[in-house]
Each structure stands twice: as C-alpha cells, then as structure tokens.
From Swiss-Prot:
GO cellular component: small ribosomal subunit
Keyword presence, tRNA-binding: yes
Descriptive protein name: Small ribosomal subunit protein uS7
Keywords, alphabetical: Ribonucleoprotein, Ribosomal protein, RNA-binding, rRNA-binding, tRNA-binding
InterPro entries, per database record: Ribosomal_uS7, Ribosomal_uS7_bac/org-type, Ribosomal_uS7_CS, Ribosomal_uS7_dom, Ribosomal_uS7_dom_sf
Subunit structure, interactors included: Part of the 30S ribosomal subunit. Contacts proteins S9 and S11.
Presence of keyword Membrane: no
Organism: Polaromonas naphthalenivorans (strain CJ2)
Family statement: Belongs to the universal ribosomal protein uS7 family.
GO BP terms in the entry: translation
Main function: One of the primary rRNA binding proteins, it binds directly to 16S rRNA where it nucleates assembly of the head domain of the 30S subunit. Is located at the subunit interface close to the decoding center, probably blocks exit of the E-site tRNA.
Molecular functions (GO terms): rRNA binding; structural constituent of ribosome; tRNA binding
CDD domains assigned to the protein according to its UniProt record, in alphabetical order: uS7_Bacteria
Length: 157
C-alpha cells in the first residue's frame, strides 16, 4: 500500500570529537544493541591507530578516502522478464552508495584476524585507502557482476 507522503529523513548529529556527520553515521553502523559508547571507543581507537602508524596524516581524511574508494558505482538487481530472472545492472543512489560502503567496511573489519575491533578497523581503513582489503574486494566483485551482466542493462527499472 503506497504511502500518502514521503517519510522525512532523520537528521544525524555530528560526532562529538571531529564534528563529522559521516563518522557519526558510521558509528551508528558499528553500534550493536544500542551501545554507542562501545562503538565510539572502537572508531576513535581505530583513528588513533591510523594517526600512530602515519604521523602527520589526518585520520579523518583517511576515513573519507577509504569510504570514497569503497563506494560502489553500479550494482545488479534481479528483474523477472518472461519467466526468467535477469541480473540487471543499475546505478547506485548516493545515499545507498554510502550505506553499502559503511556496511562492507564493517563486515570486512569483522572478518579480519587482529586482536581488537579497533585494530581490525584501522587496518581495513588503511588498506582501503590504498585500494586493497576485504571491503575493496567486495566492491570489485559487485562491479564485476554488473560488468558481466551489461547485456541486460536495457531491462532497467
């Protein structure tokens, strides 16, 4: 059933330390069970690790660069045409692009072998700035799928 009006977007307040909205959004992605203080500790710990490993480099800049590298441009969506399902490549909206990048970054960091989550996240962020790592692998996989199914792009939604 369609909605009568568009649902307003919730405004996310910037994080307390850096005053960055994207970092606050990522904090919400990392957070589990409403434990924001834990998520805060993980993220700020990761940014401190980045600063320690690369003195003089702004950790917030590294975070934005990593997210920018992970963002997917295209993805595939299933479309049923004449009894067959086709994987149709579609462009990703900017808001979804950001959400996917953050989700993939979190998942890739979780799967790493380091001792603490903040260390895992720091290393994943550093690798993403260099164009490597699990999150980048995921993005490349999605791009490859879209490229492989380019022939079905005329089935756009």
């Amino acid at each position: 059933m369609p909605r009568r009006r568009e649902v307003p977007k919730r405004e996310i307040l910037p994080d307390p330390k850096f005053g960055d909205v994207d970092l606050a959004k990522f904090m919400n992605v990392i957070m589990q069970g409403g434990k924001k203080a834990v998520a805060e500790r993980i993220i700020y710990g990761a940014l401190e690790q980045i600063e320690k490993k690369n003195p003089g480099k702004d950790p917030l800049e590294a975070f934005h660069m990593a997210i920018g590298n992970i963002k997917p441009m295209v993805e595939v969506k299933s479309r049923r045409v004449g009894g067959a399902n086709y994987q149709v490549p579609v462009e990703v909206r900017p808001v979804r692009r950001m959400a996917l990048a953050m989700r993939w970054l979190k998942e890739a960091a979780k799967k790493r072998g380091e001792k603490s989550m903040s260390l895992r996240l720091a290393n994943e962020l550093m690798e993403a700035t260099e164009g490597r790592g699990g999150a980048m692998k995921k993005r490349d996989e999605v791009h490859r799928m879209a490229e492989a199914n380019k022939a079905f792009s005329h089935f756009r939604f």
